[in-house]
Amino acid sequence: MGNTVTHFFGQALTGQGIKNVYKDLMNEAKTVYLLKGAHGFHLSAIMKKLGDYYHDKGADIEYFYDPLFDKTIEATFVKAPYNTLFLQATNPSIEPVFLGERDHVISLDDCVDEQQLSANTELIQTKQTYYEKCFNALANAIRIHDDWEVETQKHMNWRGLDDQYAALVTNLFGQN
């Protein structure tokens, strides 16, 4: 088979919060399935099975991974001729744009054992606290980086940088 499987990270954790490519992928897709509900539904395994199914039918597959959880697939994009995106859309929350046309929401809330969930309220709150600490630390780190960048640029010898770049190009490719 000539079809390919490609692996990407679908989001990045930055000082400004989570940045992701999912809106762009939704715009590229002909059909979008947004899977919404509490975490823990083994969605990654479902995403993998969906990819395997369509790969066996000859489609190219793109898997998009969560940067926080090792080997956790957040989205599976089945390329032509299907152009179908399956996306875990709870965190980050992604809402349908063309509900009922291109976008279809699959609610997993009916699968939740509310007693089990409520028994773990403290753990859920702890997770949220660490999540907020993580992004506060990233925001602080980007502020420090930006401050250093301002100071560094004040003392930069831009002409010297240009000269070094020109020397590198000459060394690699010879004279023009």
Show where each model-derived region lies:
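Short beta-strand-centered segment that lines the nucleotide-binding/catalytic pocket of NTP-utilizing
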Residues: 36, 56-71
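Accessory recognition modules or surfaces
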Residues: 13-29, 75-83
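N-terminal pre-Walker A segment at the start of P-loop NTPase domains
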Residues: 1-24, 175
